[in-house]
Amino acid sequence: MTPYSIDKYASERYTIDYGRLYNIPTVAVRLFNVYGPRQNPNSEYSGVLSIVTKCLKENKPFTLYGDGSQTRDFVYVEDVVNALIKISTETNEPTVYNIANGDETSLIDVIHTYEEIVGIKLNIIKKEARQEDINKSRADVSKLKGIGFKPQWSLHDSLTNYWKYYSEN
């Protein structure tokens, strides 16, 4: 456990317990690897896909830590917004929802898909895997599915849309 994860967990518990204590409808959400238009690739909190996008557009090298087999549960920003709307209108249960697709995708597979979409080969600089990096990440989205939410954006379509936005701006 890291201080970051402990803080996130404590915030979730506070939100849920506050709602129960005062009978206020509250939920907490966990956003997994969100990407999409207007994401700032220069932020220290930026997701890997915004950094890859910037490197592709500016023909700059991308540093890949490890072999690229590490997985993430990527979710497009429009699906995040739709999930938040669904949660806010369909439930009063004080609980935690994971907002993601529920799929594991390796970083190297995402990079290859993106290269295919944009027609540019990413200049990759490989470095040793970082000890603190998570190797596998996949969200349990059963609660989200339980209120009728289903992601609308495939990885390919969302990356295509993201590239279109980023290349025009």
At which residue positions do the language-model features occur?
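Active-site Tyr-X1-5-Lys
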Residues: 1-27, 32, 56-58
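Glycine-rich "substrate-gating" loop/helix at the edge of Rossmann-like oxidoreductase active sites
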Residues: 1-4, 32-46, 66-78, 103
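Amphipathic alpha-helical recognition patches that constitute DNA-binding helices
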Residues: 2, 30, 47, 51, ...
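Hydrophobic alpha-helix immediately C-terminal to the catalytic Tyr-X-X-X-Lys motif of short-chain
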Residues: 10, 14, 18, 48, ...
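C-terminal substrate-binding subdomain of Rossmann-fold SDR/epimerase-dehydratase oxidoreductases
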Residues: 56-169
